[in-house]
Amino acid sequence: RWVNDMTGLPIEIHTHNDFGMGVATELAAVTAGAVCVHSCANGLEEKTGNAALEELMMGLHLLYGYDTNYRLDKIPELAEMIAAKSNIPIARNKPVLGHGNFIRESGIGINYVMNDPLVMFATHPSLTGKIGEVVLGKKSGKASIIYKMGELGLGELDDEKIAKILDEVKATGITKRDVLSNEEFVNIVSSVQAG
């Protein structure tokens, strides 16, 4: 702010993400009077990258109330195109873009995922054209199994079979160190049903 006050000139900011603070620094600069911020889609650039365009746009819009005139629902489409062209995949845990932003593995709160997503997620999935998703793995509970069976149209089972399915889901999640695909889950359900 003092540079702006001292010079009276418009201030621009260009940050790198060396300490994971590129976006935070640019948001702070905007609140201090910067009128132009530099960023790159998916945060890509040399070294550790620049401030991520998508994180900056969401921060300006949601945290500071700026109307950026951008189609936020197009962010994933742009990100996927950039990832494909650059041959640099989007990390699962990347803010705004990562697949992990709108998934829930643990059984607690799965009703919120679909009915009140802001209880579970930092932003509403629909803002970027996404939906919340329940996935299954080592942290899943009975409610997750029942929910996923309904989602996939697999019918209803008694508590004993649900417990067996849950045990298999947890064991598979631990073994593969990841969440299960729908196909893996359907195979487990079929196996338990066959008895």
Locate each region found by the language model.
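Conserved, mostly hydrophobic/aromatic
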Residues: 33, 56, 149
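Glycine-rich phosphate-binding active-site loops on the catalytic face of alpha/beta enzymes
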Residues: 32-49
